[in-house]
Amino acid sequence: MAKKKSEEHSGADANDSDYQEEPNFEDPPGFVDNISDEDLLGDMLAQRPSEADGVESVVVVDNIPKVEPERLDKLKLVINKLFSNYGDIVNVVYPVDEDGKTKGYAFMEYKQASQAEEAVKKLNNHRLDKNHTFAVNLFTDFQKYENIPEKWEPPTVQTFKVQSDLYNFINDPDTYDQYCVAAETAPNCVQVGFWQNVLPEPFELETRERFTDTFVKWSPLGTYVVTFHKPGVAIWGGSSFQKIQKFPHPGTQFVEFSPCENYLVTYGPTPTGQKIIIWDIRTGAEKRSFVADGMSVLSMFRWSHDDKFVARMGENSIHIYETPSFFLLDLKSIKIPGIRGFSWSPTDNVIAYWVEEQNQIPARVTLMEIPKKREIRNKNLFHVADCKLHWQKSGDYLCVKVDRYSKLKKDKKDLDVKFLGMFYNFEIFHMREKEIPVDSVEIRELILAFAWEPIGNKFSIIHGEQNSSNVSFYEVNKGVKPSLVKRLEKKSCTHLFWSPRGQFIVMANLTMGTFEFVDSTNDYIISASPDHFRASEVEWDPTGRYVVTGVSSWKVKEDTGFNMYTFQGRIIKRTILKNFVQFLWRPRPPTLLGEEKQKEIKKNLKKYYAAFEQKDRLRLTRASKELLEKRSQLRETFMEYRNKRIAEWADQKSRRIMLRGHVDTDNLETDEVDEEIVEFLVKEEVTLLE
């Protein structure tokens, strides 16, 4: 109880009016407080030590093999190697029975609790072998499960969100294609516009400000468009491009869709290398993640055409994972000593890989059938410096470009290998023929580019000197060696772009911005040779009707924009866009019509010509009428503005006269103006005539 001042200062004046007795804060006798300590001091009580303190960094591993004492050391080595990838392990306990045999579980203590949480996240449900799959939990989880309430409460019902039609873009009756145009409006701020390529002028579908930080990318079938942000990436779709799913992966620099759009792979840097995460697109769940040592090459994963398998190359091996479990195929990698590269067939579950020369053993190209892992074709190659694998889009052919040498020189000091007398071979595998025969084409000049015709049996190459190269076209037929059908000499092109439908090809020089359009069925005649200075990209639309060339601000800062051409090279649209960075046609899914139905339509195509031509005429007439109406409206708007300004100018006449010394300068006669011509000598030259 607080003491009174009168007691503390006995000599004080009791009648002092400024003196007041201090309040008494003690509870009266028998008082019962109805406020609990948790309500009153909850924030402080939350910090008090608990029984779980000290075990937050302990994990419990169930379903480990039960082994005898003589095999325990080997088991510890395997499990410790696996769990030490996620932190420093300070203590491990393997309980054993009376006979010294392990009981099938173990306790592991990490140095930090965060390391234990990461181990649980990554190794729970990890499959050690066909009989043992880990169940990994934090030690503190047992307390959580003990405190489960006895009375069950049903979960809250979440309202169903109706998702818009993701495939409405292919329902257009006139089958107009869509495209997106990206322009950087500020650092890390890119505006993206979506357009429909309607004739005679494209129609704007949607424009999004600050849609992405860097660039956008379409999914293989055109269902989604992906955007990049600091926290991760997001995919959008539907008629108004709504957000469908987001994937948290900070610093993502590159993404890759599986061919059937079931999975998304994100690549992002870490302080020690690069982290790769595979996501389920529909659920947004993380299926599996990998940490690569060093900055690995982007797109290190290769998908099978049907999304059933995904593969990556390791040291002297290929790792093939099955979906949707993402476990290794048959729980083990395929050992291939000396492997240097591999690629999936675009239409079949067949992997092509090549092995370098080793100890007098020749290099080898192998075709392997998955999941049987059966080698269906081998081809030995000698004096090989490098190989590149090129599949034709239809999967009918595989071309292996082989860089060969005549002489090998090794430097004893730095162990560098120099290849002398280089020449090149094209090994053509006929995938649809019995026993897969292989043809060879030898080229003695430097190969600058190679491209298959997507639908057809031709391929083209650029060879020779860079400033004056030749373009050769070869045709591949059953039972005969590939034949040279045309050579275009002295062409300064650097890239080849076939139409998605075949037949037409663009030979491009992306250094100078020059292009040549070639028809491969009409004696390879060059139909047009347009220029687009500093153009750095070429994009065919999915139907092969239009080609776009673009000048990106990633390369230059002035005159950025894009041009649109017909497949014959006729310019139909020029667009100058400040800070233009990207143009992408929206891909189309494959047709649902069978081959017989497609053949029937092609056979009877002439029947539809009249209807198509009439529709085109009506469209052009409607467009002309709309253009005239638009011009008339613009003229009326201008005349209205002009008359308004004339009236305003007339109202200000008195003010002008006053400012100009009471002289009406509006009606001065031109006769009062004197015109004087003055001539003067500028230069004098003297010429002597002999």
Curated annotation (Swiss-Prot):
Coiled coil: 595-645
HAMAP family: eIF3b (MF_03001)
Name of the protein this chain belongs to: Eukaryotic translation initiation factor 3 subunit B
Positions with biased composition (Acidic residues): 15-25
WD repeats: 207-246, 293-331, 334-369, 442-484, 530-575
Organism from which the protein derives: Drosophila erecta (Fruit fly)
This protein's encoding gene: eIF3b
Lineage: Eukaryota, Metazoa, Ecdysozoa, Arthropoda, Hexapoda
Annotated GO MF terms: RNA binding; translation initiation factor activity; translation initiation factor binding
Gene Ontology BP terms: follicle cell of egg chamber development; formation of cytoplasmic translation initiation complex; regulation of translational initiation
Residue intervals of the RRM domain: 57-141
